[in-house]
Amino acid sequence: MSAISSRNQKMEQQRQLMEAYIRQKRASPGMVQASDLQISRPMSGMRSNSRELHAYDGPMQFISSPHNPDQILTNGSPVGGTVAMNSTRNHSNNMRTLSTISQEADLIEEISSHELEDEESSPVTVIEQQQTAPHSANSTHSQRPSTTRQPSFNDTLDEDDYTNRNIAGAAPVRPVGLASSPYKEAGLDGSSMETSNGAGGESEGDVIGNIDQFVMQPAPQGVLYKCRITRDRKGMDRGLFPIYYLHLERDYGKKIFLLGGRKRKKSKTSNYIVSCDPTDLSRSADGFCGKLRSNVFGTSFTVFDSGNKDSTDSPRLDLAVIIYDTNILGFKGPRNMTVILPGMTEDDQRVKISSADPKQTGILDLYKMKNMDNIVELHNKTPVWNDETQSYVLNFHGRVTQASVKNFQLVHDSDPEYIVMQFGRTSEDVFTMDYRYPLCAMQAFAIALSSFDGKIACE
């Protein structure tokens, strides 16, 4: 009995240490999950009870057996009663031992699964889409009766879905014909885009004309471009300076190369070169499209085109500014992004803004002065805390399959249903990037590159 007691004490100490480790692990949930995916239960008590663990208790095991040959079953003998009481007591002790071992094994399995996960991501499993039913619920544990349907990327979440956290399968239809919207003033209105229940309202974009011209043209209204970014970290220096490739996704697994980007090695701040020539990612290349430059702390990024800053005839233009603030939901919470873009004219062309021209004011200076006449301000959609998955979630409509602090969606404050851009992880070095009007491929790719870069003041 002393050996069993000692073992119980050791297992109890290990269980307490593991519980403390799990509590510390969950105390800083900084990952953004896709709400249309299901994550395994965080607590081992919620696991299925179909799996059993068996243990050998040594010479004392026969006492708990119902076929114990040494057990005396007499009604009037006090000795028999004592043996029966001892057998019952030993049986309860053995059951507690088995229960402790079972809990210990579940905790070890739980910690092992956490340690195998990536530092920035955790794998998730896809929820099977529910068929339309009178009493089906959007969320796994939601009890609110609703009629569900097959979600599509064209659909977005409304504020009621975020309030009720009923976001696992929510995909309401975008409202048509808004009365007033700041998008119309800046040429950013997306109300003309057709809406549907998933089948074909919004067409998928394709490359038109030359690649170098296409990547700089704003996306037409009502067109969605589904892209994929791959990160190449093979080679001597690519562990610290990987190369990123942007492809436009096509049917049957086909893809079209659009842009490539890499971080310059000899630069005081983060500086990315973007080119439409995958074989020559340099400023002197014919396919050079622009660059992304950050400040010292990595909290502010500016996107430029391929123009020359010293030229007076055609100075370098500002394409976007990305600002990262401190985490919005805690020290290790999701990032808070602000993206400032040039405004759009009536013919769906960008307003030309150049910080290199002494006669003009750059995008960042206009934003600091609160001069919003020729610029448009976007923010990342705030993730919602999900009690079931113990994480922050966003509805990516199946386009994102892993959690990461890099996952985000860009919207305008006055029209949160219109997702201008979304970006998220699907595997270790593969990410999806979808964008709409008024972004172009160069702007969207540069915004994604800023998400990859390290941020001293935000981490």
UniProtKB/Swiss-Prot annotation:
Q: What's the superkingdom here?
A: Eukaryota
SUPFAM superfamilies per record? Tubby C-terminal domain-like (SSF54518)
Organism the protein comes from: Drosophila persimilis
Q: Which residues carry this modification: Phosphoserine?
A: S152
Q: Which family does it belong to?
A: Belongs to the TUB family.
**Per UniProt, which keywords does this protein have?**
Cell membrane, Cell projection, Cytoplasm, Membrane, Nucleus, Phosphoprotein
* Protein's UniProt name: Protein king tubby
Which residues lie within the region annotated Disordered? 114-205
Give an example GO biological process.
protein localization to cilium
**Where is the sequence biased in composition, kind Polar residues?**
123-155
Q: Which GO terms describe its cellular component?
A: ciliary membrane; cytoplasm; nucleus; rhabdomere
Its subcellular locations are:
Cytoplasm; Nucleus; Cell projection, Cilium membrane; Cell projection, Rhabdomere
